[in-house]
Amino acid sequence: TIQNAPHGLTSDIYTFDGWWWQSLSEVEGQDTIKDLLNVTIDPNNPSHLMASSWWNGVIEIKDNKIINVYNSLNTDSVIQRHPYCYRIASVQYDASGNLLIANSMVENGFCYLNYHNEWGGFETYSFVGENEILGMCLDKFYHYKLLWTSNNKILVINNDGEKIFLDPNKGALDESTKVNCVVQDMDGE
């Protein structure tokens, strides 16, 4: 679980052992971690977690210890920095064990760390521009990646890197001013 701490405030990561909650605040480096947004569990190792930070980049946690903070310095510049901080909106593992990353307000806003430990990314700026990427949803059936933005649009990327932009208000009876989340109907109805 995460103690949400917006606006550049430090935040704690807690783990539960079945009886007690333990903070990672006593772990070296924890006191510099800010603006945690979400955590994803490695499907191949439940004690291996990745967290997205709207300040630091991608935080790697293993056996309740922070073991790495990924940013432009250790990802071959795949994770890019907005002028004053990293803006990682979401991290998720796909069915193949690749870590997918939504990196907001940069040229390559959709990044990945594949299961071979290779970094890569897809250009999103021509679609998204300076609009913030607010979140990411992975389609479990057709493997589309959906990134929703602060300008009320949804960028859809397929496995070949092809992209389309969806406007949720085209054809909608009730217009929306902002996409807050995207979920998938798992039984296809």
Predicted segments, located by residue:
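Carboxylate-rich, polar loop motifs that coordinate divalent cations or form catalytic acidic clusters
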Residues: 1-189
